[in-house]
Amino acid sequence: MADKKGSSSEKLLYCSFCGKSQHEVKKLIAGPSVFICDECIDLCNEIIRDEATASEKDAAAAARSDLPTPHEIRESLDQYVIGQEQAKKILAVAVYNHYKRLKHLGKKDDVELSKSNILLIGPTGSGKTLLAQTLARLLNVPFVIADATTLTEAGYVGEDVENIIQKLLQNCNYEVEKAQRGIVYIDEIDKISRKSDNPSITRDVSGEGVQQALLKLIEGTMASVPPQGGRKHPNQDFLQVDTTNILFICGGAFDGLEKVIMQRSDKTGIGFAAQVKSKEERDVSEVLPQTEPEDLIKFGLIPELIGRLPVVATLAKLDEAALMQILVEPKNALVKQYQKLLAMEGVELEIRPGALSAIARKAIRRKTGARGLRSILEQSLMDVMYDLPNYKGVQKVVIDENTINGDAPPLLMYEEQQPKVAGSN
């Protein structure tokens, strides 16, 4: 019992937990057949606070362990993307900070962390799209690629910018929560630049108009998307997707941007400190890293959009050595893919170093970068892949420089027989 008889007729009350009487404590709170004093309440609150702090620390540690560090992100990118070291470092830090920020959301704090979307600038075939794809695969988040050239303002013929979010939803089976933490890669962003750096008087539905529409999406808005796809109509219930926490990566070749940068640097470089290098001597890969917001405005992007893409990474033009590495080194290297295809026929594929060099040189001449490597190799192997299922006893196919240049067909090596040229009887 929490009450005891004293010497007088007065009934003394005691704390059911520590046993102190009502005279020894400041306050005694009554419950059904029990009492608790203010000291025991303070002690309970202290225990709860300590346990809550410990669980918060454990949760934060678990959240950090789930998220790869910038070094781990960079290492994963290295497995698929050759070169572009500075761009990979910039992307690794930006993506790490973005998802760290998402884990911080919901906590009461004076400092509000804003989103840092990314702009990738680099020539065709330098790895912009592959970098974005690899990041999404590593982080296991929904990912979509959109082509800026197909977009128009709402109400005009073409794709509405909100179609991008619809595709993102489709890629995660219409799970809105997942979509709101996804990555959107908008390619060819340079192709929707306005025609001059002055605000347009006439309507530009596929240039400045699209930039304005994208601006709302990128900075964060509630996008209305028809459920399970389909066209919008007035009497329809829409899915509401908040784009505030979606990471937007915009990419483009920005052909001619180097001229804008050189014009600016030539003006600021007059005098004894001016660089002596001529415009012809300055490589595009040297110039693009000097990109400033004013250059992008001059090129035709609106200032508001540039402001929403604070992280800028430039990718260098791939040289012959880098293209040769791309052919053989990444996890999904092109040579490995074709070796796997021929291995399914029980045939070994050997591509000699001279052939790799010839493929790289051909891609450079075509100005297609890494993107053009597959078509060159496919063209060289086309006849072999067509005839191989009908051949018997072929052990190895050899591709050399002459095959790539179109001077000779691939060499077929038969079991315990002399080499034979493909297509000969």
From Swiss-Prot:
ATP binds at P123, T124, G125, S126, G127, K128, T129, L130. This is ATP-dependent Clp protease ATP-binding subunit ClpX. Component of the ClpX-ClpP complex. Forms a hexameric ring that, in the presence of ATP, binds to fourteen ClpP subunits assembled into a disk-like structure with a central cavity, resembling the structure of eukaryotic proteasomes. Coiled coil: none annotated. The keyword Chloroplast does not apply. GO terms for molecular function: ATP binding; ATP hydrolysis activity; ATP-dependent protein folding chaperone; protein dimerization activity; unfolded protein binding; zinc ion binding. CDD domains: RecA-like_ClpX. Residues 3-56 form the ClpX-type ZB domain. Signal peptide: none annotated. It comes from the Bacteria. Pfam families: AAA_2, ClpB_D2-small, zf-C4_ClpX. InterPro entries: AAA+_ATPase, ATP-dep_Clp_protease_ClpX, ATPase_AAA_core, Clp_ATPase_C, Clp_protease_ATP-bd_su_ClpX, ClpX_bact, P-loop_NTPase, Znf_CppX_C4. Belongs to the ClpX chaperone family. Transmembrane segments: none annotated. Keywords: ATP-binding, Chaperone, Metal-binding, Nucleotide-binding, Zinc. ATP-dependent specificity component of the Clp protease. It directs the protease to specific substrates. Can perform chaperone functions in the absence of ClpP. The gene is clpX. It comes from Cupriavidus taiwanensis (strain DSM 17343 / BCRC 17206 / CCUG 44338 / CIP 107171 / LMG 19424 / R1) (Ralstonia taiwanensis (strain LMG 19424)). GO terms for cellular component: HslUV protease complex. Zn(2+) binds at C15, C18, C37, C40. GO terms for biological process: cell division; proteolysis involved in protein catabolic process.
